């Protein structure tokens, strides 16, 4: 029973870490990354459709994304969706390909992005700590129902804390990498 609680806690902490990585990958650095356009929705037959379903996005070079639209009739809709997104991008089309040059980040914008990254990181840490709290509550419930002894409870809580410390450290590493990426480019 305790092993299942620990495994469940570790799995949930891993999911929290992956979610954090996903959120942070959408924050623009100076480098062109196709994931930057993942959140863009394009109006397609009256429905908002993810850009990824309508086009292929690749990094052409360090500062340019190339969006190859599958259906020529959608080029203007895709261009408009990129232009009206809050990413501050200015696309230009050439045939079925839309080129999206990424403007260089200003020092002020880099600092703002680092604040956003730190905020996301704090949310990631809170998620990991919430998983720890849930696991500890389950362990205490087992103690209350007299399914485990106090020694087993303390040992299990220590192991949960060790797992938590590992994931908090991983969150810090992800944040440090993203901050370095933002400041280096």
From Swiss-Prot:
Output the HAMAP family linked to this UniProt entry. RRF
Instruction: Report the protein name in the record.
Output: Ribosome-recycling factor
Which family does this protein fall into?
Belongs to the RRF family.
User: Pfam families, alphabetically?
Assistant: RRF
Q: Which domain of life is it from?
A: Bacteria
Alphabetical list of InterPro entries matching this protein: Ribosome_recyc_fac (IPR002661), Ribosome_recyc_fac_dom (IPR023584), RRF_sf (IPR036191)
Subcellular location, principal: cytoplasm
Any GO BP annotation: cytoplasmic translational termination
Q: Which GO terms describe its cellular component?
A: cytoplasm; cytosol
> Which locations, inside or outside the cell, does it occupy?
Cytoplasm
Provide the species name. Haemophilus influenzae (strain ATCC 51907 / DSM 11121 / KW20 / Rd)
The molecular function terms of the Gene Ontology recorded here are: ribosomal large subunit binding
The cross-references to Gene3D superfamilies, in alphabetical order and at most eight, read: 3.30.1360.40, Ribosome-recycling factor
Q: What does this protein do?
A: Responsible for the release of ribosomes from messenger RNA at the termination of protein biosynthesis. May increase the efficiency of translation by recycling ribosomes from one round of translation to another.
Q: Which SUPFAM superfamilies match?
A: Ribosome recycling factor, RRF (SSF55194)
UniProt keywords (A-Z) are:
Cytoplasm, Protein biosynthesis
